[in-house]
Structure formats: structure tokens, C-alpha cells
């Protein structure tokens, strides 16, 4: 039986898994739709995830450049149409994937005439340029340029001066970096219906990344960061739910209590009728339903949902569980065979 304190979180509706709506470039753009959420939770979760997505995910960026013949960033390079300041701005847009946490060196050598693109940069084996068509500069005929870059990993925004080594050679130009692989995040909260109740939120996250991380993975990592930070505030131990129970004494592979019929749960008439009308016969059928699926059952409301969740919790079970190979063959025969276990 759940306690009053347990009901603080157990009676809240749990949303379905996010639905991913891929953009024209699935590796970079997508919308994630989450519903149903308790009223107000769309804004709460959307704002928290957006802030973490933009500020806290690890990524790679160019943090410094040294150009042959250039002493400082306000110089002009003979035969190069762009000045150094413009080149530095272009370098900030180079999208990079790098697994190592050790800074790496990259080199660019080019001869004119023509555009010099990011794809011409010579990279170590564990570094990849994700937007090779990005134009870095344009060379006139007969001109050439050589640049050496430092690339590193980090999070958030770091100012250029923080990237200047103490032993930096003359001509080394530090670059401020936006490490985050997430380029843009927006969210929208709308009303949504579950069953007959129009009192829930639908959260839509609109995410664009640089391609080093997919939108859905970026949300997963952001959620993991929030989980890790919030865990520190939980000052009590939660009881472990025994989902196996008597299964250890049988060869079923699951708890034989799942073979018990739902009409034996002593539910209210309304809840029992809703389960019957939805062809939910056994507890094993019931626990595999999500809360959202249950609320879509005709005449099934929040009161019935809370009643069922409380009864299942008293048995060490909950909605949304997975039971491999369910339903088993000859389920009625198995129910009689293991009647003493249930």
C-alpha cells in the first residue's frame, strides 16, 4: 500500500515516450513531442531542458589559430580577400566532432585562386569536420595560405583570453568558443486531452544541433544531467519493488501473480467495468498498459487510475512494465497450476 508521501509522485500521470519528428536533416533537426504532462509541467520541463541543452552539453570547437605571416587578428593577408577578423568569425562556425579530451592540432594548406573550405583542413584520425562546405576564406590567383588550429572539448561559452596559453608564440590568436553541440532550442506548450480530461500539457521541443549529436540524444543527455543534479535533494530511501517475487520458485520466468485475474483485485465497480470493457483480463495484461493508454479507456478517469496504481503498488507492481512472451500459451491452465503461488 502506498503512503501519503508516496502519492506525491505516484499519483502524477507519466507521459508516453517522446515522439521524434525528424526535420529535413534528421542528424541535426528534430522536434520531440511529450504528452500527457501534468498541468504546468510542460513549461517546467521545457525551460529546464532548454537551459541545460544550451549551456551544459560537451562539444568541440577551434580555440586558437596561427596563420603564417600574421602577427595579430587585425592584420590583412596578401592575396586573401577576407581580413583575419572575418576568418576568425568563420572559424567559429566550423562544426567538429572529437571524442578525445586532449587538445588536438589541425592544419590547413591552400593555394589560390578559389574558396578555401573547412573540408580542406587536415585532421587527426579522431577528429571530424561536420560542415566541410563552410567557406573559411577566398584566395586570389597565385596566393597561398597556411593555418594551424588548436581544437579542444568543453561546455558552454568560453572567452578567447581563457584559451591563450602562457607560452603562446607570437601570432597565436585565441578564439572564444561555443562548445555546445546544440545550436538552437525552442519549446512550445499546448493543451492536450487524455480520455475525457482536457487538463494536461503537451510539450514540443524544437532542437537544432551541429550534427555531432542527434537532437534526441542531446535531450537524453540533458535529462541525465538534471537527474544527477536533482538526485542530491532526495533525502530518503525508496523501497525496492519486487517485480519477480515468487517467480524464483517457478519456471515461468515471471511472477505468477500476473496470472491472477483483475476481477480479484477488489476494485470499484467503475474501475472493474472499464477494465472488462477494454478486454483486460489478467494482471499481466494490466501492468503492460501505460497511464496514458489507461486514460484513453472510455469512462476511465483519474480517480480510477489512482485506485489501480495504489493496488498494484501494494503488490510490488506498476503500470508500464514489460513482461517478455506475454501472454503465455494455455494461460488458464497455468493460472490453475500456480494457483497456490497467487
Swiss-Prot record:
Q: Does the keyword Transcription apply?
A: yes
InterPro entries with a match to the protein in the record: DNA-dir_RNA_pol_insert, DNA-dir_RNA_pol_RpoA/D/Rpb3, DNA-dir_RpoA, RBP11-like, RNAP_asu_C, RNApol_insert_sf
Q: Which SMART domains match?
A: RPOLD
Q: Which Pfam families match?
A: RNA_pol_A_bac, RNA_pol_A_CTD, RNA_pol_L
Q: Which UniProt keywords apply?
A: DNA-directed RNA polymerase, Nucleotidyltransferase, Transcription, Transferase
Keyword Ribonucleoprotein in the entry? The reply is no
- Class in the EC hierarchy, top level: transferase
Task: Tell me the GO BP annotations in alphabetical order.
Answer: DNA-templated transcription
SUPFAM superfamilies in UniProt:
C-terminal domain of RNA polymerase alpha subunit, Insert subdomain of RNA polymerase alpha subunit, RBP11-like subunits of RNA polymerase
Q: Which GO terms describe its cellular component?
A: cytoplasm; DNA-directed RNA polymerase complex
Name the Gene Ontology molecular function terms of this record.
DNA binding; DNA-directed RNA polymerase activity; protein dimerization activity
Residue segments, region Alpha C-terminal domain (alpha-CTD): 254-342
Q: Report which reactions are catalysed by this protein.
A: RNA(n) + a ribonucleoside 5'-triphosphate = RNA(n+1) + diphosphate
For this protein, the Enzyme Commission number is: 2.7.7.6
Q: Which HAMAP family match?
A: RNApol_bact_RpoA
What subunit structure does UniProt give?
Homodimer. The RNAP catalytic core consists of 2 alpha, 1 beta, 1 beta' and 1 omega subunit. When a sigma factor is associated with the core the holoenzyme is formed, which can initiate transcription.
- What does the UniProt entry state concerning the protein's domains? The N-terminal domain is essential for RNAP assembly and basal transcription, whereas the C-terminal domain is involved in interaction with transcriptional regulators and with upstream promoter elements.
Sequence similarity: Belongs to the RNA polymerase alpha chain family.
* Protein name per Swiss-Prot or TrEMBL: DNA-directed RNA polymerase subunit alpha
Amino acid at each position: 500500500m502506498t503512503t501519503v508521501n508516496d502519492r506525491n509522485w505516484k499519483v502524477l500521470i507519466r507521459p508516453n515516450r517522446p515522439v521524434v519528428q525528424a526535420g529535413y536533416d534528421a542528424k541535426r533537426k528534430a522536434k520531440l513531442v511529450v504528452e500527457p504532462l501534468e498541468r504546468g509541467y510542460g513549461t517546467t520541463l521545457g525551460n529546464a531542458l532548454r537551459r541545460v541543452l544550451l549551456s551544459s552539453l560537451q562539444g568541440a570547437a577551434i580555440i586558437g589559430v596561427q596563420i603564417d605571416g600574421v602577427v595579430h587578428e587585425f592584420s590583412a593577408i596578401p592575396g586573401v580577400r577576407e581580413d583575419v577578423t572575418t576568418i576568425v568569425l568563420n572559424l567559429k562556425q566550423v562544426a567538429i566532432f572529437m571524442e578525445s579530451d586532449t587538445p588536438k592540432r589541425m592544419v590547413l594548406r591552400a593555394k589560390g585562386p578559389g574558396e578555401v573550405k573547412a573540408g580542406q583542413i587536415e585532421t587527426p584520425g579522431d577528429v571530424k569536420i561536420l560542415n566541410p562546405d563552410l567557406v573559411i576564406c577566398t584566395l586570389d590567383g597565385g596566393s597561398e595560405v597556411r593555418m594551424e588550429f588548436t581544437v579542444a572539448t568543453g561546455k558552454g561559452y568560453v572567452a578567447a583570453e581563457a584559451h591563450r596559453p602562457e607560452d603562446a608564440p607570437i601570432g597565436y590568436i585565441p578564439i572564444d568558443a561555443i562548445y555546445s553541440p546544440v545550436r538552437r532550442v525552442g519549446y512550445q506548450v499546448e493543451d492536450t486531452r487524455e480520455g475525457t480530461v482536457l487538463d494536461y500539457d503537451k510539450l514540443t521541443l524544437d532542437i537544432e544541433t551541429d550534427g555531432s549529436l542527434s537532437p534526441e540524444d542531446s535531450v537524453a543527455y540533458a535529462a541525465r544531467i538534471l537527474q544527477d543534479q536533482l538526485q542530491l535533494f532526495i533525502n530518503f530511501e525508496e523501497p525496492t519493488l519486487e517485480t519477480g517475487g515468487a517467480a524464483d520458485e517457478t519456471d515461468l520466468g515471471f511472477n505468477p501473480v500476473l496470472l491472477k485475474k483483475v476481477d480479484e483485485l477488489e476494485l470499484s465497480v467503475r474501475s472493474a467495468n472499464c477494465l472488462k470493457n477494454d478486454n483486460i483480463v489478467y494482471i499481466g495484461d494490466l501492468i503492460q498498459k501505460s497511464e496514458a493508454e489507461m486514460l484513453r479507456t472510455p469512462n476511465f478517469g483519474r480517480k480510477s487510475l489512482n485506485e489501480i496504481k495504489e493496488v498494484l503498488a501494494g503488490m510490488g507492481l506498476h503500470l508500464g512494465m514489460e513482461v517478455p512472451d506475454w501472454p503465455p500459451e494455455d494461460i488458464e491452465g497455468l493460472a490453475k497450476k500456480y494457483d497456490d503461488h497467487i
